[in-house]
Structures are given as structure tokens and as C-alpha cells.
Design a protein with these regions (language model features):
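Periplasmic/extracellular electron-transfer cofactor-ligation site
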Residues: 400, 406, 410-433, 458
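Electrostatic cytochrome c docking/interface patches
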Residues: 385-408
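Periplasmic c-type cytochrome electron-transfer domains
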Residues: 363, 367-368, 374, 402, ...
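Polytopic transmembrane helical bundles with strong interfacial aromatic enrichment
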Residues: 1-382, 386-388
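Extracytoplasmic electron-transfer domains, predominantly the class I c-type cytochrome c fold
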Residues: 430-458
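Conserved beta-strand positions that form and line the central face of beta-propeller blades
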Residues: 87, 391-395, 437
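Inter-heme linker and motif-flanking segments adjacent to c-type heme-binding CXXCH motifs
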Residues: 146, 422-425, 444-445
């Protein structure tokens, strides 16, 4: 129950914060067109800003309450403000919470003030800057700051969240723009709508690319080379789900940008234009629903044990892939060939989209290239695995462990591997690798500690 309250608190405050930030960025961009400042649909969302700022504050209170309960291990502290204040005063998390709460309160005050004034572009720029403050402060309570509280660790994650807000936060404004009543006296024309949407679409493309780049940087630090955890841990499965939802969103955004928006601006039949507007309304709504789900998954992911700290107690597959599967130079070149072919497949997808290939051609050609790349590279990278392959000792090695290991080695391994583990084979040809050499030959890189444990216990 506490975990559910914590997840909903984090999700609600982050969603509200991103919407205020993204809408203000969108308005600051489109306010270059003066006609936008006199429309009613923009007033509707402006009136929601103070309410959303209030949601941010209530979400932060929920975060403090659940954090206190989890930190103390006492469920009743969820409702005990006195213990909350102890956490706020005595912990670093509490100090960061104060900064987040003060910045959210400032955001509430400034939104209440500006909705009473005549609209100016600099108002939205200022509100966007203020809305960014709670977001940036929240990154100091993330996994990125857990290992090292430094600019290099936190900045990529902060930029990643702000870029996400630029895209996701603008979706409600775009929906209200699409659903604005054309019969109103201050309504904007379909041409103006398409102009605003096209301008945002031009901004969204580099934003999404930078979002992917910063996401890769942040994820790489949290995975730390332990890529097997991506298919065998809670963090990995949540990340895969997040990427799957993102792929659907990008597909919708591609069709919005390249199919329906051009029809709105192209002179032609009104029926085609109405159909494109209907499609935009339908699919942008669907995109927003997926975006809400994406933010929820990202919120849960941000509070899940990172992949680099995950313990894979039971590897569920009878195989694994490794670049150390072979030390044969020819085999390694073949693996590189397969990887190059996979990159060619990605290039074929990009070329097909740019050249407007048919759907069949766009699926078949990259599909054949991907299958060929897999058939070339994967067999050479495949190693046999066991449930214990990625198992790690739960305690550090000590003198007793080493002593017991020496006895086991002397009783079971000396005959083949020698007393020092350098092997017993008398190899004359330097090109031939001694398979019994456990000390100096590179073939031992294909074995994990868990594999060795499996061999000793079976």
C-alpha cells in the first residue's frame, strides 16, 4: 500500500510539473504569432496551472510521508508529521525536499499572479524557468546522484527530464488547440493551427533525438556494462517496457509529422483536411495516454534498484551472448561483419522512410538484413549458461573461503589443471592454446564465477 501511494505521489507531481513546463515552452514558441494571445482555449489551460502547482505540492507531501515510513520501517509514520519534520531537519533527502517544496510554492504563487495579467511572451518564459526548478531539484534525489553528487552525474539526467517535459508537457496544449471551437469569435483558423503544430513538430524532432541521447547516457551509467540484467531483473524489464511504449509514441509522432500535418497545410479538398484533423485529434489523444503511461513507468523505474546493483539469482536462459566467446581473430572479424550488417539494416530503415518505400519493402529488406546479421554473429557469440551463471557471492571472500577453495582444487582439479592452475599439457606450438591453463590463457574470459560454481557443485 505504501509503495502504491509513493508511486502515485511521484507520478502526479512529476506529471503536473512537466505539463506546466511543457505548456509554457509551447506557448513561448507560438506567442510569436500575436493571434494566439487572444484565444479562449489558452485561457482554459492557464486556469489549470495553479491547480497543477497545487498537485505538485500535495505530491511532494505524499513523497515525504512515504519516504519517512519506508526509512523508519514503521508504517504508522506515514501519518505522523512529527517524524516527517525529523526527516526534513536531519537528512540530506529532507533538505532537498525543502528546496523542492519552496520552488513548487514559488511556482504556485507566480501562476496565480500571471493569470490575472495581460498575456506576454516573457510571462511564459519566466513560468517555464520557475517550473524547471522543482524538476532540477528532484534530480538530486535520483539514482544518478546516489553514487556521486556531481555536475557530471546529475546534469545528463536533469537535461533528460527537461527535454521530456518539453515534449510531453506540450501535449495537453496541443490537444486543446486541436479541439478548440472554430465557431467562437476569437477562434483561430485551421491554417494557424497547422502552423503552430508544424512549428512544434520542428522543435519536437531534435528534442526527441536529444532525449534518446541523454537517456542512453543515464542508462549506461546505471547498467555499468552488466547488460545481462536488462533481460533478467526488474529494472531491465521496466526499461524494456518503457522503450516499447516510447517506440509506439515515436511511430505516432512520425505519422503526425509526415502524414496528417502536411494534409492540413496542403491546398486541396476540405474533406481531406477534415479527415486529417480527425486523425490528429484521435492519435494525439492516444499519444498522450501512452505518454502518461510512459511517465508512470519512468517514475517506477527511477525508484527501482538499478541494474548495476541487481543480483541475478537464477539466470532463466540456457545460453548467453558474449564478445569474449571466442579469441579466434577470424571469428571476431565475422562478428564485426554481423554487427556492421545490423547497422546497414538500421540505415535501410531510415532510407526507406525518407524515400517513401512501400510497407512490404520497408519490412522485408531491413528484416532480411537483421536476420542475416543475427545468423552471422550470434552463433559465434553464444555460450552455454546455467542458472548460476551470473550468481555472485553474497559475502566477500575471506581466509576460510580461500582455504576451502584450495582443498576443493587439490581434490578435484589438480590432475587436469596442475597445482598452480597453469595446466598440465606440454604445448610446443605457441599458436595452440592449452585448454587446461586457467591462469594465463584468455579463454578463461568465457567463464563466469557462477559457471565455476556450477562446475564445482555438479
Amino acid at each position: 500500500m505504501i509503495e502504491i501511494i509513493a508511486a502515485l505521489s511521484r507520478w502526479s507531481q512529476l506529471t503536473a510539473n512537466l505539463i506546466i513546463f511543457g505548456c509554457c515552452v509551447f506557448f513561448a514558441i507560438t506567442m510569436q504569432h500575436r493571434s494566439l494571445s487572444s484565444t479562449r482555449w489558452i485561457e482554459r489551460i492557464e486556469r489549470k496551472f495553479p491547480w497543477m502547482a497545487g498537485i505538485i505540492l500535495s505530491g511532494l507531501i505524499g513523497i515525504l510521508a512515504t519516504t519517512t515510513s519506508e526509512a523508519t520501517g514503521i508504517a504508522e509514520n506515514l501519518w505522523n508529521p512529527y517524524v516527517w519534520f525529523d526527516i526534513v531537519q536531519q537528512t540530506q533527502i529532507g533538505h532537498i525536499w525543502i528546496i523542492r517544496t519552496l520552488s513548487a510554492a514559488f511556482l504556485l504563487a507566480i501562476t496565480l499572479y500571471f493569470i490575472r495579467l495581460k498575456r506576454e511572451r516573457w510571462h511564459y518564459i519566466l513560468v517555464a524557468i520557475v517550473a524547471a526548478l522543482p524538476i532540477i531539484a528532484g534530480t538530486f534525489m535520483s539514482h544518478s546522484s546516489a553514487d556521486e553528487m556531481s555536475f557530471a552525474s546529475i546534469a545528463p539526467y536533469a537535461v533528460h527530464i527537461l527535454l521530456a517535459g518539453t515534449w510531453f508537457g506540450a501535449l495537453p496544449a496541443i490537444l486543446l488547440l486541436l479541439f478548440s471551437d472554430n465557431a467562437q469569435s476569437d477562434a483561430i483558423t485551421a491554417t494557424d493551427k497547422s502552423g503552430y503544430l508544424h512549428k512544434f513538430s520542428q522543435l519536437a524532432m531534435p528534442v526527441m533525438l536529444l532525449l534518446l541521447v541523454t537517456g542512453v547516457i543515464v542508462t549506461d551509467r546505471l547498467v555499468a556494462g552488466l547488460y545481462h540484467t536488462l533481460v533478467a531483473s526488474n529494472y531491465g524489464w521496466l526499461l524494456n517496457l518503457k522503450l516499447s511504449i516510447l517506440a509506439i509514441i515515436l511511430l505516432i509522432a512520425y505519422h503526425v509529422r509526415n502524414t496528417w500535418l502536411p494534409i492540413m497545410t496542403k491546398p486541396g479538398r476540405d474533406m481531406d483536411r477534415q479527415h486529417s484533423i480527425f486523425s490528429l485529434k484521435k492519435w494525439v489523444r492516444i499519444e498522450f495516454i501512452f505518454a502518461l503511461l510512459l511517465v508512470l513507468i519512468a517514475t517506477i523505474l527511477a525508484n527501482t534498484l538499478p541494474a548495476k546493483h541487481s543480483m541475478v539469482q537464477n539466470w532463466p536462459y540456457p545460453f548467453r551472448f558474449s564478445f569474449n566467446a571466442t579469441d579466434d581473430p577470424i571469428a571476431q572479424e565475422i562478428i564485426r561483419l554481423g554487427m556492421a550488417l545490423f547497422l546497414v539494416a538500421l540505415g535501410a530503415i531510415w532510407l526507406g522512410i525518407r524515400s517513401h518505400w512501400s510497407k512490404l519493402k520497408l519490412v522485408v529488406i531491413p528484416g532480411v538484413l537483421v536476420l542475416s546479421a543475427s545468423a552471422i554473429a550470434l552463433p559465434l557469440m553464444t555460450l552455454k549458461s546455467y542458472p548460476e551463471t551470473y550468481l555472485k557471492p553474497s559475502v566477500p571472500f575471506d581466509a576460510v573461503s580461500i582455504s576451502n577453495g584450495m582443498k576443493l582444487f587439490a581434490e578435484n582439479c589438480v590432475n587436469c589443471h596442475g597445482y598452480q592452475g597453469k595446466g598440465t599439457g606440454n604445448i610446443i606450438d605457441p599458436k595452440v592454446k592449452d585448454p587446461t591453463d586457467l591462469l594465463t590463457e584468455p579463454h578463461t574470459a568465457s567463464y563466469t564465477v557462477g559457471n565455476t560454481y556450477h562446475y564445482l557443485t555438479h
